[in-house]
């Protein structure tokens, strides 16, 4: 994948997650703030938890940072896979957001 294709894909992911956070806040009356600066999206939850998603274009990776650690993902044409064999991006983000919000949240891209 070219760098341009990668950046467009990341833009779609960040847009989707940002919209989802706004929807969760409105529909479930949760205090979640989504802050975007370029290719970095930070979700701030009521308890002060920060979840940061950003891209590393040179490595063609999407990174997720939370209290539980930092995770790197590569796109295989269908999904973002953990480079160390852990849960995929969607499952991992669902888990960290659910833990931070205190209610089950499901990420869909």
UniProtKB/Swiss-Prot annotation:
Keywords: Iron, Metal-binding
UniProt superkingdom: Bacteria
GO cellular component term, pick one: cytoplasm
Gene Ontology terms: biological process: iron-sulfur cluster assembly
Molecular-function annotations in GO: ferric iron binding
Keyword Metal-binding listed: yes
Role of this protein: Involved in iron-sulfur (Fe-S) cluster assembly. May act as a regulator of Fe-S biogenesis.
Family per similarity comment: Belongs to the frataxin family.
Protein name, entry field: Iron-sulfur cluster assembly protein CyaY
Gene: cyaY
């Amino acid at each position: 994948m070219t760098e341009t294709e990668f950046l467009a894909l990341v833009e779609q992911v960040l847009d989707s997650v940002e919209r989802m956070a706004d929807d969760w806040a409105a529909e479930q009356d949760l205090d979640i703030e989504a802050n975007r600066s370029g290719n970095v999206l930070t979700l701030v939850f009521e308890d002060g938890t920060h979840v940061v998603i950003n891209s590393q274009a040179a490595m063609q990776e999407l990174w997720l940072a939370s209290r539980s650690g930092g995770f790197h993902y590569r796109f295989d044409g269908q999904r973002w896979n953990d480079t160390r064999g852990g849960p995929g991006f969607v499952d991992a983000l669902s888990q960290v957001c659910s833990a931070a919000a205190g209610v089950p949240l499901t990420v869909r891209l």
